[in-house]
Swiss-Prot record:
GO terms for biological process: phosphate ion transmembrane transport. It comes from Chlamydia pneumoniae (Chlamydophila pneumoniae). This is Probable hexose phosphate transport protein. It comes from the Bacteria. The chain crosses the membrane at residues 34-54, 70-90, 113-133, 161-181, 185-205, 257-277, 302-322, 331-351, 363-383, 394-414, 424-444. Belongs to the major facilitator superfamily. Organophosphate:Pi antiporter (OPA) (TC 2.A.1.4) family. It is a multi-pass membrane protein.
Amino acid sequence: MNVWTKFFQPPKHIKEIEDQEVVKKKYKYWRIRIFYSMFIGYIFYYFTRKSFTFAMPTLIADLGFDKAQLGIIGSTLYFSYGISKFVSGVMSDQSNPRYFMAIGLMITGLTNIFFGMSSSIVLFALWWGLNGWFQGWGWPPCARLLTHWYAKSERGTWWSVWSTSHNIGGALIPILTGFIIDYSGWRGAMYVPGILCIGMGLVLINRLRDTPQSLGLPPIEKYKRDPHHAHHEGKSASEGTEEIERELSTREILFTYVLTNQWLWFLAAASFFIYIVRMAVNDWSALFLIETKHYAAVKANFCVSLFEIGGLFGMLVAGWLSDKISKGNRGPMNVLFSLGLLFAILGMWFSRSHNQWWVDGTLLFVIGFFLYGPQMMIGLAAAELSHKKAAGTASGFTGWFAYFGATFAGYPLGKVTDVWGWKGFFIALLACASIALLLFLPTWNATEKNTRSKA
């Protein structure tokens, strides 16, 4: 723990720069630099997370595994990733995101390379489970950076734009693996992303930094004169800034701002079911199109890319609407988008007798649009309904539930599909989307103010 503390501990705050013109110039520079660095870095996390998914059809043909066996491999990643998101969230709230995010990315690159060197289910599960653990090092440091460098009054926009990194990464990896598989098989589709991510990890060490105060800049609330954190407790802006900049103990983070927060439990439970749908569509839709409509792998993977692109637009629209229409309250958009998701899944099932790829691509685009809105908003709402210094833990807590749910998109859903066919697959998705909608309803008016009043 001593070695961990020395290596990963956040840098100390330095004397605040007094020249306001210098402060303004430096804030502008570092906000842009940190944003594009963590944005691109998270795209690369997706390269090592989803490489196996799109190599799966070729791996089946090469090694003869069935869907349930491959589902086990997928479930090991989601299970270890889910636990890691919570544990890593606690660690990241007390760590330097510069090294935390970068080292995690490099280790995921190594696990992809070792996966490509293996041929047995046991080794596949081992490397993919280890990959899942270090995938959990990607998101919590981003939550920490987003809450320290961007004020609440603007955070919905910045958060939604950053969240499109999920979709860009998810859209690029099937195209990348599709071309690599054509030239060097599924093993090459594991090696190349792994090598790229090791290199990107070194770039992150160079580009990222921790809090504004570690660079001599004032806290973002002071710089932006953001009243949100102070006014809901009846404090002055300066008192509110001092309170939210106070470092919290692990006990305070867990038992004051996370585990006793009723809204986080609703969000976490909804996230469980949203992620079953998300990972099911992402992991199995290409195989669905190949088996039922006999599409070539490249065409099926392209349709899945449209799912990610739809999600990109969905997150941007959801973030903008929650800022402008519901005034920073994320609950209404979660409910409305979940309702749209239900109808989009129904449309995909009823189109199963049509073999036009553009119809399937459009429907996957619409599913992505309505699914990624609440998927993004859950993490944002969790961070805002807890505490600035507990943002990584709060988002990690909901992420823990999310990826525990995602494990059900692996072996359990693979078994459902083996036994009841694709009809059973779609019934499961509809059930999950319906439950998520019901869980979002109580959070319609959830805000920081009524979170504190119930504490």
